Curated annotation (Swiss-Prot):
Keyword Lipid metabolism: no
Membrane topology, as annotated: Multi-pass membrane protein
Family the UniProt entry places it in: Belongs to the TMEM126 family.
A Pfam family recorded for this sequence: TMEM126
The protein's assembly and partners: Part of the mitochondrial complex I assembly/MCIA complex that comprises at least the core subunits TMEM126B, NDUFAF1, ECSIT and ACAD9 and complement subunits such as COA1 and TMEM186. Associates with the intermediate 370 kDa subcomplex of incompletely assembled complex I. Interacts with TMEM70.
Function: As part of the MCIA complex, involved in the assembly of the mitochondrial complex I. Participates in constructing the membrane arm of complex I.
Protein source organism: Homo sapiens (Human)
Keyword DNA damage: no
Annotated GO biological process: mitochondrial respiratory chain complex I assembly; response to food
Domain of life: Eukaryota
Modified residue annotations for Phosphoserine: 34
Keyword tags: Chaperone, Disease variant, Membrane, Mitochondrion, Phosphoprotein, Primary mitochondrial disease, Transmembrane, Transmembrane helix
Gene: TMEM126B
Protein name from the UniProt record: Complex I assembly factor TMEM126B, mitochondrial
Amino acid sequence: MVVFGYEAGTKPRDSGVVPVGTEEAPKVFKMAASMHGQPSPSLEDAKLRRPMVIEIIEKNFDYLRKEMTQNIYQMATFGTTAGFSGIFSNFLFRRCFKVKHDALKTYASLATLPFLSTVVTDKLFVIDALYSDNISKENCVFRSSLIGIVCGVFYPSSLAFTKNGRLATKYHTVPLPPKGRVLIHWMTLCQTQMKLMAIPLVFQIMFGILNGLYHYAVFEETLEKTIHEE
């Protein structure tokens, strides 16, 4: 009896008939095994690129760390100028009001508060704005000089005027103003000292311009380095 082209009891090799796909199957298995043993090109590329990516990230972190250190030093310098302006204004208004009480307290507050206000304002409105909004160079310089005027001159002057005016009223070191003319009386009394505050005003504008130029130069330098490394 013949079943599927060969007799019963005979093997396919003996009859000379080879089933379709019997010789191709071992070749396919061998190719699959060889491909399975070798790593794919994408994995090799990933292994080669990984050290390069890590090196670029480390360099970028180094650039950002150096940039942060430079900005912190610059903010501290700018805040120190505001602190000296506060000390100068406190000295002038204490002489104006002839106050000799609480010297350490007033000098400490007039040195610390302008310093902190300048550092915080410079961080928020110059550095953070420079990296988030990408403001222009002119805008950066304008903001920095405005911070120098407000936090380095107007704020310490008003603070020294208020603190020493209260001490003068408390200890009666100067004649009290008449009713209804308090502000005019104090302004007339401190007219000379207010004119002398033009000295720190000029310095704070100058330091503000230099501060803005410095922050923008550091930002541009770091940006160029990171783009070049990428």
